[in-house]
C-alpha cells in the first residue's frame, strides 16, 4: 500500500500565485499578511523581488475564479491561493457571490490539475471576519500551509 503525503521539503523551487479580493480589504489584507508570514517561515521568498511568489489583486471574491484560472493555466505555478471575505448583508447577494466563488474556484482546480486553495471567509458579520483574519487567529496562515502541503503532495502523486 502506498501512502502519499505532502512533506514540506524542497520548497525552494515552489512557485505560488496568490489572488486577493480587494473588497473587504480590511480583512483580506490581514489574510494576505498571515499567508505571507507562513510562506516565509517555511522558506518561500516573499520579498518584492521574489521569483517564487506573485500576488494578483481582483475587485472582489466573484472575480477570484477567472484570475485563478488564468494563473493556473499559465503553467508557472504549482499552487494558487485565493483570499477573500464575503460578509452577509440584507440581500441575497451574499449567497450568489459565495456560491459562484466556491464553485468557480473548485472548477479551476479540477479543470487545470493545479491545487487552488479556497481562502474565502464567509461570515455573518465583519467582527467574525476580523476574528478569523487576526484578532483570534489568522486563517491566512492556514491557507499558506495548505498550499505548501498541496504543492508538495502533487509532486509525489503518480503521474506528476
Curated annotation (Swiss-Prot):
CC annotations in GO: cytosol; riboflavin synthase complex
Gene Ontology biological process terms in this record: riboflavin biosynthetic process
Keyword Transferase: yes
Active site: 93
Matching InterPro entries: LS (IPR034964), LS/RS (IPR002180), LS/RS_sf (IPR036467)
Keyword list, A-Z: Riboflavin biosynthesis, Transferase
Pathway noted in the entry: Cofactor biosynthesis; riboflavin biosynthesis; riboflavin from 2-hydroxy-3-oxobutyl phosphate and 5-amino-6-(D-ribitylamino)uracil: step 1/2
Enzyme class: transferase
GO molecular-function term, one example from the UniProt record: 6,7-dimethyl-8-ribityllumazine synthase activity
Residue positions binding 5-amino-6-(D-ribitylamino)uracil: 23, 61-63, 85-87, 118
Family matches, as CDD domains: Lumazine_synthase-I
Superkingdom of the organism of origin: Bacteria
Chain positions recorded as (2S)-2-hydroxy-3-oxobutyl phosphate binding sites: 90-91, 132
PANTHER family for this protein: 6,7-DIMETHYL-8-RIBITYLLUMAZINE SYNTHASE, 6,7-DIMETHYL-8-RIBITYLLUMAZINE SYNTHASE DMRL SYNTHASE LUMAZINE SYNTHASE
Entry function: Catalyzes the formation of 6,7-dimethyl-8-ribityllumazine by condensation of 5-amino-6-(D-ribitylamino)uracil with 3,4-dihydroxy-2-butanone 4-phosphate. This is the penultimate step in the biosynthesis of riboflavin.
Family named by the database record: Belongs to the DMRL synthase family.
Annotated protein name in UniProt: 6,7-dimethyl-8-ribityllumazine synthase
Organism lineage string: Bacteria, Bacillati, Cyanobacteriota, Cyanophyceae, Synechococcales
